[in-house]
Amino acid sequence: MLRVDQTGTILIKNGTVVNDDRYFKSDVLVENGIIKEISKNIEPKEGIKVVDATDKLLLPGGIDTHTHFQLPFMGTVSVDDFDIGTQAAVAGGTTFIIDFVIPTRGQSLLEAYDQWKKWADEKVNCDYSLHVAITWWSEQVSREMEILVKERGVNSFKCFMAYKNSFMVTDQEMYHIFKRCKELGAIAQVHAENGDMVFEGQKKMLEMGITGPEGHELSRPEALEAEATNRAIVIADSVCTPVYIVHVQSIGAADVICKHRKEGVRVYGEPIAAGLGVDGSHMWNHDWRHAAAFVMGPPIRPDPRTKGVLMDYLARGDLDCVGTDNCTFCADQKAMGKDDFTKIPNGVNGVEDRMSIVWENGVNTGKLTWCQFVRATSSEAARIFNIYPRKGRIDVGCDGDIVIWDPNQSKTISKDTHHHAVDFNIFEGIKVTGIAVTTIVAGNIVWSDNKLSCVKGSGRFVPRPPFGPVFDGIEQRDKVRNELLRKVDRKPYEDDNTKNSSK
Ligand code: URP
Ligand code: ZN
Ligand code: ZN
């Protein structure tokens, strides 16, 4: 569904192309949605749209690995739907999102997938893909995972270790899900928090009379995230399959990931904009509405060092790509938990501000180079989820998803100017220098001069093939480790009587 003026053809002049391995000054020509030429002094053909990018950077469109648009969750539905959510995305320089299909316990994965895809196809303003959560385990689930991988373009499945009595799976179920992921060449993803302990912690807080939003963090401290992260990695490594920890929110969890990586375990970690941009002390704010707006799981940590340390991990490459977990609820929805924090719908914004928050806290602090920024916000996600270099790179033949980034232009983030449906912004008042001035999706300008010009439903579903680069070398690692598992040859057991009688 394209507008007539959407030709997918554009010439960008005089910009600095930044990929994750190098940057250079060049013009870029996109034709019919695909990058056609990258060279200096491309002459514009007659009638072609030309944009000047002098003193600006040309970045591969951002990839948000983790959104929940119009998610039915905790008795309500997140307010950023696939239309508003992808509008907010492109306004911030993100041109590709991966959302999560979350079937209910007992529901067919295929049925849920079809439902999510319909919701998205009708509304998306940029390309997208779907992860699928596995919330129960059976032969049927196993068969449907295969269909999703082989016929529906899914190469990632998420397990929840939290949300007891709804999405949470047991360790044994997780073991079987991971084994199936390995057979199918799909990456296993995990929401890592010890759900049983969270459940007990919640009861304890309520018994103590702590009913406000601070009870959310107090009932699910860092240690429960670190413990579950460790457990997920150990289980995945026991079946020798790559595992991706979504929304790494604490120093303890990041340390665990780093320790296992040092030992050669194939684990990936995803920090999110919230954890890199703010701290969780807001949950102690005296204004209930303000405090509740920061409630998400795992909690944004109150330890003020956290965001800087997570950024250090990202810069070192010990955390991989930045998502958002964008899952927004307005004040009246959050108020479902006004007397009991366990009923506050979990989730915050991020999809619009992710790129600027990472630039501000990463590039402007001297922690990330331009190339590392591109890696963290786009290329690495494309590699892990096996759509690179179609996405995540500016090169001939790649999709024409390009952001014209002004590293010197500033803005102050606010709910009054953001493009979300939600009535709160967790980054309110933060000044960022480094913003997307123009966003191009498939060769069409969708954001420029502070104005959106998207076409609802014009985004495409991008299938992701299995056995991506995260599986490279996995077979050999498994083989070598299995060779160490040796049976000991022994004579058959004889009890003492048999032994004596044979003497
Ligand atoms: O609080 C969160 N994270 N809400 C969305 C669901 C999830 O756990 O990712
Ligand atoms: Zn989660
Ligand atoms: Zn999530």
From Swiss-Prot:
Residues holding Zn(2+) 2: K158, H191, H247
First and last residue of the signal peptide: none
Sequence positions bearing N6-carboxylysine: K158
SUPFAM superfamilies: Composite domain of metallo-dependent hydrolases (SSF51338), Metallo-dependent hydrolases (SSF51556)
Enzyme class: hydrolase
Enzyme Commission number: 3.5.2.2
Record's keyword terms, sorted: Hydrolase, Metal-binding, Zinc
InterPro entries reported in the protein's UniProt record: Amidohydro-rel, Hydantoinase/dihydroPyrase, Metal-dep_hydrolase_composite, Metal_Hydrolase, Metallo-dep_Hydrolases_sf
Gene Ontology CC: one annotated term: cytosol
Cofactor, free-text remark: Binds 2 Zn(2+) ions per subunit.
GO term, biological process aspect, one: pyrimidine nucleobase catabolic process
Binding sites annotated in the UniProt record for substrate: Y163, N346
Keyword Metal-binding: yes
Residues the record lists as binding Zn(2+) 1: H66, H68, K158, D325
Post-translational modifications: Carboxylation allows a single lysine to coordinate two zinc ions.
Keyword Metal-binding included in the entry's annotation: yes
Pfam families recorded: Amidohydro_1
A Gene Ontology molecular function term of the record: zinc ion binding
UniProt subunit comment: Homotetramer.
Role according to the record: Catalyzes the second step of the reductive pyrimidine degradation, the reversible hydrolytic ring opening of dihydropyrimidines. Can catalyze the ring opening of 5,6-dihydrouracil to N-carbamyl-alanine and of 5,6-dihydrothymine to N-carbamyl-amino isobutyrate.
Family designation: Belongs to the metallo-dependent hydrolases superfamily. Hydantoinase/dihydropyrimidinase family.
Name under which the protein is recorded: Dihydropyrimidinase
Originating organism: Dictyostelium discoideum (Social amoeba)
